[in-house]
Regions:
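Short hydrophobic/aromatic helix or loop-helix immediately within or flanking a transmembrane segment
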Residues: 94-113, 118-141
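Short acidic/glycine- and proline-prone juxtamembrane loop motifs at membrane-interface regions
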Residues: 192-199
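Membrane-lumen/periplasm interface segments of specific transmembrane helices
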Residues: 66-81, 95-96, 225-227, 233-278
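Membrane-interface alpha helices of multi-pass inner-membrane proteins
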Residues: 183, 187, 205-209, 217-243
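Start-transfer (signal-anchor) and selected internal transmembrane alpha helices
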Residues: 1-84, 272
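Transmembrane-helix motifs of polytopic, lipid-linked glycan transferases
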Residues: 133-135, 149-169
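Transmembrane-helix signature of polytopic, membrane-embedded enzymes
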Residues: 142-146, 162-184
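Membrane-interface transmembrane helices that cradle and orient dolichyl/undecaprenyl
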Residues: 170-172, 207-218, 248
């Protein structure tokens, strides 16, 4: 009970502080109060580090190599502890766990090609990841191999976007550490499986990066892709809306009754945010 109360207080306090900062950064002046000033202080974190194509390619290759290394380690572990492993096909079958079977079925026969007693059980799984699997499978001709390589590549691409994102506000060392911590985090094992976690990570990282760069049409496109990966992808509309409010000082314009400018910014910039909600 006490833990729940303390957690609620911490969460709502954080929401309150974030709301104050959003309002302040959007151009709406609050009363001159020491407490409010302390809560809404905004330190500039702009980094002098500029990413290069060589760095991004290196991040992609290292991330992909890491996923391959984890895969090879898993093969060794399977041969050591599983007596039923007799070939590469048996190894691939070990990755057909949890939701992997459903994404495999969607990529293989579509949503209508599999049902249980007339119920299309795969309908709850979003389509973008199996679509990409099916495209990659045109080359490799094995959906299990195609799915794994798709996950590896998407994870590596996500690392590239996250590296670029962190480099906007932090130093190169911080960006590198962020990628390393992400890679060794226990949940990261799902980024190398036949599931769409890597797809959601990739599209979310791309969306957040373009939010910070204020490229709103790309925000809409990548945000829509995130929503096609998982339902939670639509939540990216929240940071997009916050950045739009802050960057263009919308509250300040509304306070000054500059409705024309607000409307112009909405239909030329902000309307792209709604693309991910459709």
């Amino acid at each position: 009970m006490i833990i729940s109360v303390l957690s609620s207080i911490a969460i709502w306090s954080a929401v309150f502080v974030i709301a104050l900062r959003i309002i302040t950064n959007s151009g709406l002046a609050l009363p001159n109060n020491k407490v409010i000033s302390a809560l809404t202080c905004n330190k500039s974190l702009v980094s002098a580090h500029q990413t290069t194509y060589k760095e991004i390619i290196s991040v992609f290759l290292l991330a992909f190599a890491f996923r391959i290394a984890v895969f090879l380690f898993s093969i060794c572990a399977m041969y050591m502890f599983n007596d039923n492993i007799n070939g590469f096909g048996d190894i691939l079958e070990q990755y057909m766990k949890w939701d992997a079977n459903n994404y495999f079925r969607i990529a293989n026969v579509g949503y209508s090609g599999f049902d249980i007693d007339g119920d299309f059980t795969t309908i709850v799984f979003f389509p973008l990841y199996p679509w990409i699997m099916k495209i990659v499978n045109l080359i490799f001709r094995d959906l299990r191999v195609s799915g794994l390589l798709t996950s590896f590549a998407l994870y590596s691409g996500a690392c590239c976007f996250l590296y670029k994102l962190f480099s906007i506000d932090y130093s190169k060392s911080v960006a590198v550490r962020a990628i390393v911590y992400l890679s060794v985090f226990p949940h990261a094992l799902f980024f190398g499986t036949l599931m769409n976690e890597s797809m959601l990570l990739f599209t979310s990282a791309a969306t957040l990066y373009y939010i910070r760069k204020h490229k709103w049409y790309l925000v809409g496109i990548w945000g829509a892709a995130a929503a096609l990966s998982r339902m939670v992808g639509i939540l990216l509309a929240i940071p997009a809306a916050v950045e739009w409010l802050e960057h263009y000082k919308i509250f300040e314009k509304l306070k000054n009754k500059d409705i024309k400018s607000v409307w112009k910014l909405f239909y030329s910039k902000g309307l792209w945010i709604f693309l991910m909600l459709l």
